[in-house]
C-alpha cells in the first residue's frame, strides 16, 4: 500500500510530543518560535492550546502579523493566552523557557540570540541548520541543551493510525438494528 502523509505535520507532532514529555507541563511555559511558516505556525497553535505562552518571530513582519492574527482567531475561545508577534528575535527569545528554530534551511538562531537566552533555556532545531556554528559553540560553552526532534515516534503512530483506520473501514463498517435502536459503527453512514 501507498499511504499519503504530510511530513510537516509529523514534525509538528514530534516536536509537541517531545516538549510535552521533556517539560512535563506546557501550561505557563514561555516558548519562542523563530520562523512562523507551515511548521512554526502549526506548532504555535498546538502549544498555545496547551496553555503555553507562545511568541513568534518572523523575518517578514507583515506576514507574521497575518499568521499570528489568524492563529489567534482560530484557537479555541477558552484558550486564555494569545500568540504574540515580535519584530526582534532577541527580544522575543530573551525570557524563553524553550527556543525553537523553525526556519526552512537557513540559520535563524545566531550567537547574539544564544548570548541573550536564559541559561536554562532549551534550544530545539526543527529544521536543518537553524543554528549557526557560533550559536552552537556558545550554547555548548554555556552548557545549554540543544535538541533536534526525531519524527520516528510520530511516524510510527501515524502508520498505526492508518492501519487501524484501514481495518475499521474493511471490517467494521455497517449498521445493526437492535429493534429499539440502530447502532452505527465507525466508517460510512
Region annotations inferred by a language model:
Residues 12, 39-43, 64, 106-110, ...:
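Short glycine/serine/threonine-rich phosphate/pyrophosphate-binding segments
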Residues 81-154:
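Rossmann-like adenosine-cofactor binding region
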Residues 1-27, 160-163:
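Glycine/serine-rich phosphate-binding loop and adjoining beta1-alpha1 elements at the start
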Residues 48-49, 72, 115-118, 139-141, ...:
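Short, solvent-exposed amphipathic alpha-helical segments in soluble enzyme
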Residues 128-130, 134-189:
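Adenosine-phosphate binding glycine-rich loop
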Residues 20-101:
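Glycine-rich phosphate/diphosphate-binding loop of Rossmann-like nucleotide-binding domains
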Residues 5-6, 34, 57, 126:
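Structural motif
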